[in-house]
Amino acid sequence: MELFPELKNIKVPTEKSRLWKDECCYCFDTPENGEGLFIDLIGLLAFSKKYVQLNHQKTHHHLYLNFKKVAIVNEKVKSPTIENGGEEKPPKKLAIGVEGGFNVEDEEIKYEEHYKLYIFPDDKFLELSDPIIPENVRVCCEKIKTLNSQSRKEEIVSWNAESVFPSAFAESIIQLDNNTKKIDPKGPWRCDIEGCDKVENLWLNLTDGFIGCGRKYADGTGGNGHAQEHFNQTQYPISVKLGTITKDHADVYSYPEDDMVSDPLLFQHLTHWGLNPNVMVKTEKSMAELELDQNLNFEFGKIQEKGKLLENVFGPGLTGIENLGNSCYMSSVIQMIFAIDSFQTRYLKDREASFKDITQDPTQSFEIQMSKLAHGLLSGDYSIPLSKPSKNANEESEAATQIGIAPKMFKSLIGASHAEFSTMKQQDAHEYLQYLLEYIERAEHSRPSWIQQANPTRLFQFHNEDRIECGSSGQVKYTRRLENILSVPVNLDDATNKQEVAQYEETLKQQNGVRQKDQEEIRPIIPLVSCINGFVEPYRVEDFLSPATGVKTFSLNSSRMATFPEVLIIHLKKYTYNADYTPKKLNVFMDVPDIIDIDSLRGRGIKEGEVPLKEGTINTTTKVPEPSFNQEVLDTLLSMDFPLVRCKKALLATGGKDAELAMNWIFEHTEDPDIDIEQTPVNNNNNNNNSSNSNDKLFVFNSQDVDNIIGMGFTDSQAKLALKNTKGNLERAADWLFSHIDNLDELVAKDNASTSSINPSLIPQSTTSLQPVSDGVGKYELLGFISHLGNNVTCGHYVCHIKKNNRWIKFNDRHVQLSEQPPKELGYIYFYKRQLN
């Protein structure tokens, strides 16, 4: 071994080292596959046996730690349950497939781990105890055995960020000295209110020992709300749910904080009332389990096509994706895009060439990880039936029927530059799809020279035509911008079953708003065609400063599609906000046709008889008028105790019409050093050294955002132009710059030359130089759809259905089945492919 020059370069890794040991860099083999994985002792990257030679060719490294996991035959550990007296840890968050989420584990397979030193190209294995191994090599191997892999480290960081927080009231509770009252830890318990017969869903108030029933559930079960009433009368702040108390966990609720909390002194508070958590067992469902049941039961039954025995399917293109912890939003998007031929060709054809010639760290190469992903999904190598369906611990909503793939490296790489997608939280699949397409678009600018296939994201791109009609002059202006997703409104007025919905709601009203256990839920049925037609409906914008007349009026704005893409993505705006700005979902059923014709949406530019809107100018020697604000929206923000200057800045940056958008802007920019500095829009175009036009003065720039972009190598003018075109969103501004990198100077020059007086925050953005896109007829056939189960995008579960070879396939994590009646009515994002004939 003294022949190997890298011996002196082998250093013992630390907790800070970037170590990948659970997934091959070039394929989805794991330590459980074949001969296991081979971990480069210098690079700390893992490879399956077939790719060790490739790594050696690139690095000239000879020494690897062979890591192999072997299942223990016929030895399975049954998870303890309520029924068998064990202590089942309940979920702490409303989520499927996460640690602390809904526990769906039935059986857990145990593994033995085996480690050996491997020498390449000698193809020689050595036991780690072999005296021939140098000490520094042995210590390095032993350390690798104990360290967490990079994916595991990122997971731990994310979970720590999502912990339940201690109550602010817990340590100040003064428990009443009631020596006569002790709670029997074994029960039975009953609500203390006379005449109340509730013996479940009971909450013990930690201050006075009062036992009260909880709230009533949506199906009519639950309690009568006596625990809440007791707090209203006494203001005693914290209660614990009886039946959920174990030595490791209890459901603790703080009434003043209106949230589930932790109590650092819970053991002390419980023993005061005679309860010893060390000997208590769980006998009731936790609040997270109950809420999950309520939110998912109805929709999940439809997604699963309840009552039907669906056939499991295997083979190329039928590979499931392991839930990495609330990663179903990512999986559903990945499955959909790789069902499209152009994505398959783009990332499969030159896969081996990319593996061979890209010298970059493979875990940091988007080209390598996308090619790896394409092969993993499409080859069929991992679409292998399990001998018995099983569920990974805290990972999947349905028993997996195949090995599938676990794209941990891909998730780590894509999420590294995004604050939300790097976490284990549930995300919006629409936002992730948009982010991924922009990521691919940027990567295509620097793709390897040997790749000749077209940029696959161009399939989705189309030119959107925006029309502005001046309310006073009737003159019009047409602009175009590049889009890749058609987002359409969901209007409840378009429901085709209004009478049935009204009858159902009246029945619910008579039942005090509680749906009976076996009562069918009636939802509004909205035709998808109505949503598409709603996209072109004009809307009125107030406080429009007309360039034609020079006075404020209103404008009528509308949009159409100037071109039709090869693949049309339709996103439903199903998610809105309650009056308190908490997100909510419109619970509707969609009427979705397999074939749609959208030719009526085509925009053809200025029409005969229309007069183009004249571009006015502003007197450069005068102060630009103070922008006006929608008083109702401004009052809404002020009522939330935001300072006036912050409210005005937020309204300027977000368009001035949406209080929720403005509120989010304020929260996102709270730490800005100039957040409370008044900025008066002054036109100083007389300064010849000023490279920004007057529109810059109407747009409030965050100086820190501008500096961040300049730090990336862009100029001040380029940074401000990008921020204007993305309404101040820093991440989108960076994306915008990279996607327009080829003609940035031209765009800046045209922007500087512009003298339009139209407030850019009140009109659609105009892209002065659009890249060409494909166009064709507007007739499309449904290719697939992504469904979301749950009440909002921050919780629940995503599933996708894809039509392959005239068969509908359901992809639910690693459970892949034929779908007999695909629940198209539950879709959130629909993919339509243009009909060739």
Swiss-Prot record:
It is an enzyme of class 3 (hydrolase). Residues 683-695 have a biased composition (Low complexity). Residues 676-695 are annotated as: Disordered. It comes from the Eukaryota. The active site is at residues 328, 797. Pfam families: UBA, UBA_7, UCH, zf-UBP, zf-UBP_var. GO terms for cellular component: cytoplasm; cytosol; nucleus. One of its GO terms (biological process) is sorocarp development. Residues 628-669, 700-740 form the UBA domain. GO terms for molecular function: cysteine-type deubiquitinase activity; zinc ion binding. It catalyses: Thiol-dependent hydrolysis of ester, thioester, amide, peptide and isopeptide bonds formed by the C-terminal Gly of ubiquitin (a 76-residue protein attached to proteins as an intracellular targeting signal). Residues 319-835 form the USP domain. Its EC number is 3.4.19.12. A zinc finger (UBP-type) spans 166-277. Keywords: Hydrolase, Metal-binding, Protease, Repeat, Thiol protease, Ubl conjugation pathway, Zinc, Zinc-finger. InterPro entries: Papain-like_cys_pep_sf, Peptidase_C19, Peptidase_C19_UCH, UBA, UBA-like_sf, Ubiquitinyl_hydrolase, UBP13_Znf-UBP_var, USP_CS. Required for development but not growth. Belongs to the peptidase C19 family. This is Ubiquitin carboxyl-terminal hydrolase A. The gene is ubpA.
